[in-house]
Amino acid sequence: MLNDFPISPSISHFLRTLGDNSEIVLDKMLEGPKAFLSALIYHKLNRPIIILTGVERSHGFIDNLETFTNRKIEEFPAWEIVDDSPLFNPDIIGKRFEILSRLKANSKEIIFCPLQAALQYVVSPEILKQNILSFAVNTECDFTKLIASLPPLGYTKVSLVVEKGQFAVRGGLIDIFPNHSLTPYRLEFFGDEITEIRAFDPESQQSQGQVSHFYLFPTDELSLLKGGKTDFFSYLSPDTVVIFDDLLSIEDKYSTLHKTLSSLPFFFSVESLFTTLKKFSRIYCTTSPIEKLSVSYTHLRAHET
């Protein structure tokens, strides 16, 4: 789709300016042009993008970006915090591990990352790698060892799999419902060889079709964090571009989060965040004129020194 748009000299200059560790401020940016420039960075420069924001998913920006790039933009979610305590939602934990795994594989991604998620520690790459299981048809997998390995990953053995985080064993079949998946999977074994993998409906238990492979992530993030933690941005490739989607909203969000997150052990300071981000190219976007931006921009830049 982008091939249909002529690239002006000013946009060409913008793309050339975006080198390693560069820093650009774009004021009075509407959602459409912002999405268009982001898509150009992704397609023309072949660089992954992290969209850092202080608000919930900005549908105008993200919807336009999905149209320009012809891909779904996924959100890296944060834990839910209620009464100054984290809630451990299996869907959120599963999605966090899934995205981290893709980033570690150097996949060129566009990820939407709320400020709260950016300030939360993640499991170190080494710990995550040790706790991911992969399954593929026509591969060897020790049947007995697999059954023994599932409870330490947080999976509960039941007679019938109906919810995420459960597994069941019947003869040479193992049913597993990964915490990041919309459907559970049924593995059929012949000895220690996986001969077939099928998705199935947890209500009817009927098969929904064959799949060639799938990954299984842990359900317990907290215990893994105690074994080794790092920041989200350590998973990114050096050529990643970090786009600050509306500086004013990011500053407002941090003012709201600061008191709550500072008391929790698995979140770090915004000062540490901005120090980490110095190794990436950064684009600061705002809908306001540069005159109104100056106070917010100066305040945020102060955290980088």
For each of these PLM feature ranges, what is it?
Residues 1-301:
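ASCE RecA-like P-loop NTPase motor cores
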